[in-house]
């Protein structure tokens, strides 16, 4: 082989081993330069997308961690709300039952008192009617016996006077006992209400203290978000 042919073969081999992207003459290979630029842009875009995904993942993990710390206090507050509702419902129900019992008891006592005194009034009225009838009969029978009639009338008037006093006394006692019963009913209801309200205040205070004890410390959230 001549020296000229050997030189041409060596030159062709060197060109075939060279990287097109590393060519020094850009004007001779513009397609290779464009492909290299696209590879650089794609790599940068992938880095940006990867960085955004990592930030979203980190933000989600932080939110999950915050939710983990916030879930127990919310659960405790919900349970305390339900307990408070049950206590209020139970207290008002007990108060209503107590008031109904007191009113029922006083109503029964009042009815019994009215029945007792009504019976006494009826008996006394029957006696008064009977005495008036007897007085009339004796007055007609003893019309001719003035002295005896006068004596009997005097005795009858005295008896009527005493029984009218008894009737008046009975009325006064009835009104007095009715007034006492009315006052005692009001006092009993007021006392029962005060007692139930005091009990309710104690329960609410205990529930408030339990809520304060169950509340998480604020410093834990400060440490979490710091």
Swiss-Prot record:
Keyword Hydrolase: no
Swiss-Prot/TrEMBL keywords: Coiled coil
The protein's name in its UniProt record: X-linked lymphocyte-regulated protein 3B
Polar residues bias spans: 21-30
Positions of region (Disordered): 1-65
Coiled coil spans: 159-210
Superkingdom to which the source organism belongs: Eukaryota
Family, as annotated: Belongs to the XLR/SYCP3 family.
Bias kind Basic and acidic residues: ranges: 8-18, 39-48, 56-65
Example GO biological process: positive regulation of synapse assembly
């Amino acid at each position: 082989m001549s020296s000229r042919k050997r030189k041409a073969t060596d030159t062709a081999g060197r060109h075939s081993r060279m990287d097109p992207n590393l060519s020094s003459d850009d004007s001779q290979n513009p397609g290779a330069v464009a492909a290299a630029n696209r590879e650089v842009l794609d790599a940068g875009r992938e880095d940006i997308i990867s960085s955004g995904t990592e930030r979203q993942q980190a933000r989600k993990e932080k939110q999950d961690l915050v939710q983990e710390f916030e879930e127990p206090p919310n659960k405790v507050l919900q349970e305390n709300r339900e307990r408070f509702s049950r206590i209020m419902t139970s207290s008002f129900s007990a108060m209503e039952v107590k008031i109904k019992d007191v009113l029922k008891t006083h109503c029964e006592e009042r009815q019994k008192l009215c029945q007792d005194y009504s019976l006494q009034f009826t008996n006394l009225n029957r006696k008064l009617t009977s005495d008036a009838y007897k007085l009339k009969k004796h007055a007609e029978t003893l019309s001719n016996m003035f002295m005896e009639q006068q004596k009997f009338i005097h005795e009858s008037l005295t008896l009527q006077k005493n029984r009218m006093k008894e009737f008046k006394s009975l009325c006064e006692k009835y009104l007095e006992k009715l007034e006492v019963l009315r006052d005692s009913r009001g006092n009993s209801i007021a006392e029962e209400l005060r007692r139930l309200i005091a009990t309710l205040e104690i329960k609410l205070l205990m529930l408030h203290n339990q809520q304060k004890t169950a509340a998480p410390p604020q410093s834990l959230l400060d440490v979490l978000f710091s």
